[in-house]
């Protein structure tokens, strides 16, 4: 029989009685009740002097008590020292369940086999049919969800049953809750405390996506006592390390910063890890985190670990990562392979064929006509985003910018500002193309073409999200780029041509060229944007469609506000980060210069 421990409430009652307060308010308290102190029964009607002597005697005997009894007392007070910012105190009703656990950081937990997560019969459609804990259901109801999406219906029950899952679903399908709900249920069932360390680890490819998952976890865990946190590149590493040392039960992280903490933060307790989630695995590997992921998987404990790996596409690298991270015989779930289209149903997709010198004019006209809409515009490089943001804001067309060269605090503030806005324009690189759940986006504009059809799908996935979501997308194509439509058709992406009458386009070309010619800072920014555009174009993976040598540089320059192409120093062959796909296939030697030099001479002649 567990030994009762005084709660704060009972101690407070005794203090009131000691100072003459009435003994109780309920009718049941009219007669004296026994109170329990350190295993001894006393009457509440004792005098203060008798109480004091008994407490003193109890303290002396406490020193001689067995270790097991001491552990119970320690566990009831240990959580009080944790930071309120990141570590929340456990509910009083959970205190008795800490008996027999190790004292100090990293206390061992019972095996997953010792607890039973909720099981379901048949094919549940609503969250209420999952038999989830009351606290989790409160969080789901607070978020306003009732009916599950297809990926949630097919993944949550097997994950609750302890299966490893390799999942594939369209962006915007609701997979974040698919992995968070089973993870939170596991933490709750095992009664994780801060001192137990990290039990669930979610790895995300970008900082913005990590912040978004963190926001969902915060809402879902609002009624749970377990702690949650986030570690991402660009944030304060020392503050992160302090929180990890105090104990973060559910941790969201980007790969680089996670590996840093695993290797260099001594107080980071991860020996009790029960669930590993790798979200957007294909994107993690695409942006160069393959080595980091292999090291992370190797460092983390594999015994009793459930792994969930989600990827929009199943590449060879994703399969390799699945092989080393998942247990044998994982459940493969693909909710898209039977669908007619690769994009969501409520998305109206179109393209416009536009000469390079008219591209900015068309974009400017479109944004001016849609000031009351919420729009995301995608560019190919950070410097292109910077230039167009500076230009549009200068000419009183306010926009927000998001790209990889910004400091983390700026990126975070911009992301949440646009999320909370009812209207406005965000111009960005592909840093915002994967996984981000930005509410009520009306239009996706692909000003610069995507690197391939997969990037196209993820870009347009920022709109028409969720059940019955609606949205529109528009892609700008030059006449030489129409071959990309064939690739979209092969990828089951339905697009139609949009027509913009010439008389609807505001011709501000002369004013633009005058502004760029006279404003030193805009001129410098325009040159950097122009150079970055050419470099990004030359690094395109679909060279047969996007051939940098077919570009009309005079028209490209006009699109950036120059009457004639500026003289810039550019070496295309030495900086093509995306050429790695081609290099690995032996199509081109890394660092070779023939194409770059040829282009440079052509440019100087202009």
UniProtKB/Swiss-Prot annotation:
Basic and acidic residues biased stretches: 58-74
Matching Gene3D superfamilies: P-loop containing nucleotide triphosphate hydrolases (3.40.50.300)
Span(s) of short sequence motif DEAD box: 279-282
Motif Q motif in this chain: 125-153
Region (Disordered) location: 1-125, 574-606
Superkingdom: Eukaryota
TM regions (residue ranges): none
EC number(s) on file: 3.6.4.13
UniProt GO BP: maturation of LSU-rRNA from tricistronic rRNA transcript (SSU-rRNA, 5.8S rRNA, LSU-rRNA); maturation of SSU-rRNA from tricistronic rRNA transcript (SSU-rRNA, 5.8S rRNA, LSU-rRNA); snoRNA release from pre-rRNA
Compartment(s) of residence: Nucleus, Nucleolus
Ranges of compositional bias, category Basic residues: 11-21, 597-606
Protein's UniProt keywords contain Nucleus: yes
CC annotations in GO: nuclear envelope; nucleolus; preribosome, large subunit precursor; small-subunit processome
Family the UniProt entry places it in: Belongs to the DEAD box helicase family. DDX18/HAS1 subfamily.
Record protein name field: ATP-dependent RNA helicase has1
Organism: Aspergillus niger (strain ATCC MYA-4892 / CBS 513.88 / FGSC A1513)
Source organism phylogeny: Eukaryota, Fungi, Dikarya, Ascomycota, Pezizomycotina
